[in-house]
Amino acid sequence: MATSEFDLIARYFTHRARHTVLGVGDDAALVRIKRGHELVISADMLVASRHFFRDANPRQLGHKALAVNLSDLAAMGATPRWATLALALPQADARWVSEFSRGFMALARRFDVDLIGGDTTRGPLNICVQIMGEVPRGKALRRDGARAGDDLWVSGALGDAAFALAALKRRIRLKPAELRQCAARLHAPTARVNLGLALRGLAHSAIDISDGLLADLDHVLVASGVAAEIELAALPASPALSRHLDKAIAWSALLAGGDDYELCFSAPRAARERIARAGSRVRVRVTRIGSVRAVRKGTPRLLVRAPDGAALRVVRGGYDHFA
């Protein structure tokens, strides 16, 4: 017997919702927002051969589909609550959907997210997730809050996902252990939700690094009307990537590689100790990489300093979906 859309939904995506008035099973969901909170909404689409390999592990893909959306809420300092999922599938493959749902729902349970609706249809493999969360009114972290004099910080390590992709496309050769370490960041990224929550009231601005450090930091600078300077030697790299810093492709991954899903944020200098404690409390490495400054005529909006103090020319980097 052919598996129907309703069979797939009922079998793999129906679960008891904790934060929902009415969830999966009706024409629409009903949710109730906490008093004094604002609703935070984001959505991301993942397309086969554009954002992931067609033969990608479905369980890892389920994890990643939700993780990249959780990362958006992390950058806003929001608590995740609800998600919707729309899937286009070439065929109703119950085994594939079962594995995908395992990855998706395991991460949803970890962050107490209710799946409250969605859709399935036949077509080229395409995944669209909408994520919703809550933040106390007026407390959301935003891109437009960076101020001259702020420190610039990033979480975790940068470049692993882009480095893994380069290796999988045979642009660089890595040892098996190095590839495993970097590929884990590509296929199953970690959303820094707890760090985002810890930064509320400390950070002036934040963004998640999905399209590369240079590209995403530029979004903050434009939105805030400021400039910045970062120290090349301060950028945090994993042990695997650090062993290849004699290669240009490693620096490209650090500065412009996508799929990091770390947080880049600015905070006042006076908050340095509190930022460090916040990172320790949620067990996330945080690294100060530079500073925010006022815009000066004749000076680039973003300066990158080499270890010898020389200013490096920054070309447009990062990932552009329409490039």
Regions found by a protein language model. Give the residues of each.
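Extreme N-terminal cap/leader segments of soluble proteins
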Residues: 1-60, 76, 81, 85, ...
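Glycine-/charge-enriched secondary-structure boundary and capping motifs
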Residues: 1-14, 57, 90-114, 121-125, ...
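General beta-strand structural signal in soluble alpha/beta enzymes
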Residues: 21-24, 40-42, 114-118, 153-156, ...
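Residue-level signal for inorganic ion chemistry
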Residues: 30, 69, 77, 115, ...
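Glycine-rich anion-binding loops of enzyme active sites
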Residues: 33, 39, 46, 79-169, ...
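Small-aliphatic-rich amphipathic alpha-helix that forms the alpha element of a beta-alpha
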Residues: 59-82, 99-110, 194, 198, ...
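Internal active-site segments that recognize and position negatively charged phosphoryl groups
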Residues: 151-156, 188-213, 217
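A short, charged helix-loop
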Residues: 171-190, 243
